[in-house]
């Protein structure tokens, strides 16, 4: 029985809205995309790395790193496309059993973290079909002028 295929999709949008060309700006003697690919190439249980992009620069970097490319259609790179449509498009255009979505805007994820995540998923596949990362927040949170996770009168 063969092992199920794991593909990492690294989304890279040409038209960054808040910080122009953020994925290619100098960062730690490299750039965000190269840092992400450097880490992912060290994780030997990943079967394929796909740079999903509308950027010629990202495609050149994908070639430099010998990883796959998926040319993103303009609509899916626009701010008009919602997250549900975007993720559906990735799923429909990625030939794999499992997708790890790993934006290059999270450059500090370590090799060991990917191994840990993949192992946790493999060990939980009978109970779940996806995993996501979360952060334990131990602060009082407010939304629209109202407390979300506590009662001020009890504090």
Where are these regions (language model features)?
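Histidine-centered beta-alpha loop that forms part of the nucleotide-sugar donor binding/catalytic region
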Residues: 13, 74, 103, 135-136
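Short phosphate-binding loop-to-helix
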Residues: 56-100, 108, 112-116
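Conserved core of the sugar-phosphate nucleotidyltransferase
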Residues: 85-86, 98, 107-155
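N-terminal glycine-rich phosphate-binding loop and ensuing alpha1 helix
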Residues: 3-52
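Short, polar loop motifs at secondary-structure junctions
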Residues: 53-58, 136-138
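Short helix-capping segments at alpha-helix termini
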Residues: 41-45, 95, 123-125
């Amino acid at each position: 029985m063969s092992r199920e295929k794991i593909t990492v999709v690294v989304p890279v949008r040409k038209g960054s809205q808040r910080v122009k060309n953020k994925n290619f700006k100098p960062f730690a003697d490299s750039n965000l995309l190269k840092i992400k690919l450097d880490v992912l190439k060290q994780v030997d249980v990943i079967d394929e790395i796909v740079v999903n992009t509308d950027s010629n620069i990202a495609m050149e970097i994908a070639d430099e790193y010998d990883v796959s490319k998926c040319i993103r259609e303009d609509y899916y790179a626009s701010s008009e496309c919602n997250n549900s449509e975007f993720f559906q498009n990735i799923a429909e255009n990625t030939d794999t059993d499992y997708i790890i979505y790993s934006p290059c805007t999270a450059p500090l994820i370590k090799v060991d973290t990917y191994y840990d995540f993949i192992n946790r998923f493999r060990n939980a596949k009978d109970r779940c079909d996806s995993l996501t990362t979360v952060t334990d927040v131990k602060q009082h949170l407010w939304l629209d002028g109202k407390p979300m996770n506590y009662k001020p009168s009890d504090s």
